[in-house]
């Protein structure tokens, strides 16, 4: 089928702008809502690329800067209607930020703030410490992690980190207003994004034991069936502590200290004390303590290959927050260990430079972000700068290998491929601040175009944003709330050539290219689930685009 593929939300006035055609055409026009021509241009033939399987043609209309609603027309085919405006992404930004409110655990979502997506309080019982004969623990609050109702320390810490680094790097994020209720402990001066992040920080504090270690997760023993959160009344379990969770919490509390001290010194000091307590536990327990589910449990495992990157992040975050040289020394030693691991690893869960990895499974790049914020002339800060520039250069090279200008290779289309892209967009938006190369911006904007519909599925991977936005996330509350549309702003996991779930496996044997390994179906947890740490990198990257 002939398609004109375009960012379905739109473009900023002075941003690069393109559409991709999967059919031959020589010329194209941009017309307004009344059919009046606003721009004519020549189509450039790129050719076939491995990730889309399409013979692609590119229509560049970057020269059109006048605000308005437009369509692309070529060879009798039309795109969806999109906007050109400096406000083009205002709704998108509000939606992706407010999703964290909709994912709150414990709190009732009121009609005043959640509208038709309201629900009663959930998961208010104390949690049993699995395998220990101790009193149950109150760990209420925080955010539901994903399509399930679990709450996971490492995942939550990384999502919070994306948001707080977004605040540190791009001040505009503090000015995003999206109507959420006042949170406990807010003295009335917290910007909305920091009020929402406080919800998760308060929960993560409860996940820390008195000795500083941190429970890896709190979930039911197995995933709940598809029901509303308030109807999930199975016993909650706190599963064992891990050095992964403890290091991530040490890091994110130190980062949070640097932000919240401007608004609430007492709260910030509490975060720092808990960060130091976690870090002391790490020093007292130098051997890695990884995490694996007990037999019979199927909730998220969030296992990692090593804890070196987590400890590195913690040391870097504490050094940035305190300027204490002992953390620099620790980070230097951990850097050496991580380089050795990276050199010898038989199987890596990441592409590119380990010091720019920004996801829950490999967090060294988060440590690098703290070093970039330090802005010092020393070996580690130079490593961070050089790593981000080198990785951005790699991504630009990859982006030139397909007609979409997308900085993803065939191996990036894994479970949560959209997060892979969004992490790369974080790298590019950070690298722009180090070395403002035009090609970084092109690759960054092309990534956003892909997420918002300029892809061979012709679908926007953000609910409620774009004419053909996906509508069937693997998400319990939206599956059973009897409301036709899911709440807006959710980011889909996206195409996954592994096709890991039963519904996705119906695509096997069809010889599909990676970009087309996708179904918008509620059963497709390996293609169409959502999670807090798929929204958070988009918040960071979009903040960079809007800066």
Swiss-Prot record:
- Write down the chemical reaction(s) this protein catalyses: Endohydrolysis of (1->4)-beta-D-glucosidic linkages in cellulose, lichenin and cereal beta-D-glucans
> What is its EC class?
hydrolase
Q: Gene behind this chain?
A: ced1
Q: Which GO terms describe its cellular component?
A: extracellular region
Q: Which UniProt keywords apply?
A: Carbohydrate metabolism, Cellulose degradation, Glycosidase, Hydrolase, Polysaccharide degradation, Secreted
Stated name of the protein: Cellodextrinase
How its function is modulated: the record gives: Is not inhibited by methylcellulose.
PROSITE patterns (alphabetical): GH9_1 (PS60032), GH9_2 (PS00592), GH9_3 (PS00698)
Metal-binding is among the record's keywords:
no
Enzyme Commission numbers on file:
3.2.1.4
Give the organism the record lists. Butyrivibrio fibrisolvens
